[in-house]
Amino acid sequence: LAGDDKQQQSSQNRTHGKTSLSGKKTMFHKAITRLLAPLLLLAFVGGCSQPATPDVSFTTLDGQTSRLSALRGKVVLVNFWATTCTTCVAEMPKLVDTHNKFAAQGFETLAIAMSYDPPDYVRNYARNNALPFKVAVDASGEAAKGFDDVRLTPTTFLIDERGQVVQKFLGEPDFDKLHARIAQLLAEPA
């Protein structure tokens, strides 16, 4: 009964334009929460750095072994693909166009074939399609593991000049948006 009396009095106070002390505290806390929540979110998001690119080693079809860190200072598109992947094969001419459009501006493309793709198939595909960029076979699967354990193809990563992953694409990217993003990254001071 005592609880009912307090509730009834609180209700009467509100109906007569009065607010109890506990009601004022609640309103104050809500107002502060509404003000601080967006600021805390901005601080958190602003403080988050982009994921660093794994410094994977790769061997290109021409036998050159290199590390991804050797491409630092360039905007890089790393594409994990397979010759048996129809989406990969369908997007390859667009990757070629993208590479050709931006290569003279410090842009690099690296196509890494998955470990299950026979090297001879990859070599034949690259030769028959005159791929103008570096092509590697991830025979050990270590490169795919280094990039968040890539299992689906195509999976593509856009990396800025500082070596940070700025975008990840599962499936074929929207190439108009990709081109705009590459142009933006190339225009940024290093």
Language-model features, listed with the residues they occupy:
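Bacterial N-terminal signal peptides
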Residues: L36-G46
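Short active-site neighborhood of thiol/selenol oxidoreductases, capturing the structured segment around
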Residues: L68-T86
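Structural microenvironment flanking redox-active thiols in thiol-disulfide oxidoreductases
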Residues: V89-N129, A139-K145
